[in-house]
Amino acid sequence: MERAEKREFVTELNEVFKASGSVVVAHYAGVTVAQMNDFRSKMRAAGGTVKVAKNRLAKIALQGTESEGMTDLFKGQTLIAYSVDPITAPKVVMDFAKTNDKLVVLGGSMGTTTLSVDAVKSLATLPSLDELRAKLVGMIQTPATRIAGVVQAPAAQLARVFAAYAKKDEAA
């Protein structure tokens, strides 16, 4: 990489660290190219991204960001997985790490919080923002549906009573 390319890469990575909901750092030594491509495609499908960066450039890019506390994670062959949704990157990384023991999660960050391996695992078990929004909408709609049912019930009962009287009059 030439110096200008490095500057551009550091700027791009700095923007990633500032805009991401969560960042996960992992060692990938021993992961084959096919496995890495599979991992990248799974992350892309979920709405995240995986980048391999030189540790020195990643540490420079971390300066001045909320994620600056995770600079000590960048040792050895590291990759960076990130997403806007704070749950997506940890979930995809942990799912891939279950099936591939060569991918070793080192930690990460979410906003100003530096995450340990256990914290990344905990984040991976949480539902995504879209799932939480769906649950919230369902919880909000349930009382409205019940109120509508209660309000309609007396009218339905009256209609059945009138229908019964009408049938009774026709029969007589």
Curated annotation (Swiss-Prot):
Keyword Ribosomal protein recorded? yes
Q: Which GO terms describe its biological process?
A: translation
Protein family: Belongs to the universal ribosomal protein uL10 family.
Oligomeric state and interaction partners are given as: Part of the ribosomal stalk of the 50S ribosomal subunit. The N-terminus interacts with L11 and the large rRNA to form the base of the stalk. The C-terminus forms an elongated spine to which L12 dimers bind in a sequential fashion forming a multimeric L10(L12)X complex.
The name on file for this protein is Large ribosomal subunit protein uL10
Classification via CDD domains: Ribosomal_L10 (cd05797)
Give the GO molecular function terms: large ribosomal subunit rRNA binding; structural constituent of ribosome
Q: Has UniProt tagged this entry with the keyword Ribosomal protein?
A: yes
Per the entry, what this protein does is:
Forms part of the ribosomal stalk, playing a central role in the interaction of the ribosome with GTP-bound translation factors.
Keyword annotations: Ribonucleoprotein, Ribosomal protein, RNA-binding, rRNA-binding
Domain of life assignment: Bacteria
InterPro entries on file: Ribosomal_uL10 (IPR001790), Ribosomal_uL10-like_sf (IPR043141), Ribosomal_uL10_bac (IPR022973), Ribosomal_uL10_bac_type (IPR047865), Ribosomal_uL10_CS_bac (IPR002363)
Q: What S-S linkages are listed for this chain?
A: none
- Quote any Pfam family the record assigns: Ribosomal_L10
**Cellular compartments per GO CC:** large ribosomal subunit
- Matching SUPFAM superfamilies: Ribosomal protein L10-like
